[in-house]
Amino acid sequence: MFYVNSRAIIERTVGDRAEIIVQTRNKPGGPRRIELPGGRIEPFESLVAALVREVKEETGLDLVEIEGEETRIETAGINPDFEVECIRPFAAYQTTKGPIDSVGVYFRCKAAGELLESGDETLRPRWVAVEEIRRMMAQDPLQFADVDRAGLLFYLKHQG
C-alpha cells in the first residue's frame, strides 16, 4: 500500500518564544509517539483540503493561514474531466525504508480555536516551545513518530 500525507507545523509566538503543536499518536495497536497533526489524503482530495480536515479532526483547531497557499495553482475549469493542483509546501518527505511506503508534505500554518483533549486517534494536542522540541529531539529522537522525526529535524534546521 502507498500513502500520501498532508501534515501541519502549526506555529505561534508567545512573547519571544516560538511554539508549535504536537500531539501523542493513539492508534490501536500502534506505539504512542509524539507527532504533528495531519494524515492521509482521501482519493482526489487536495493537499490543502486534507490538511484543514486532519487538523480539525485531530486538534479541534481551524487553520487561518497556510504558508505557501498563495502559490496555489489549480486547473479547474480547463478540462472538466481532469483537475490538478500545484502548491509550494514548506517541505516534502518520502519514506525510503520501513513498513509503510509514503510521501507527504509539511505546511507551516497558523490556527485559531480551542485545542481538544483528544482527537481522531490522538491524545493531548498541545503547544510546545520549539527549543523544547530541539532538546527532546537531542535527548531521545525515538519518542517522535518515524515520519515526523524527519519533518521536525528539517523544521528545526530551516525554520528561519
Short names for language-model regions:
Residues 14, 26-27, 72-75, 113:
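Short, flexible active-site-adjacent loop segments at beta-strand->alpha-helix junctions, enriched
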Residues 29-34, 77, 88-91, 99-160:
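Nudix hydrolase/Nudix homology domain
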Residues 1-35, 63-64:
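N-terminal strand-loop-strand
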Residues 25, 38, 130:
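Active-site donor-binding loop signature of nucleotide-sugar glycosyltransferases
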Residues 1-3, 98-101:
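A short catalytic or substrate-binding loop motif that flags glycine-/basic-rich loops and adjacent residues
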Residues 36-81:
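The catalytic Nudix box helix
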Residues 26-27, 79-84:
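Short, flexible, mixed-charge acidic loops at enzyme active sites
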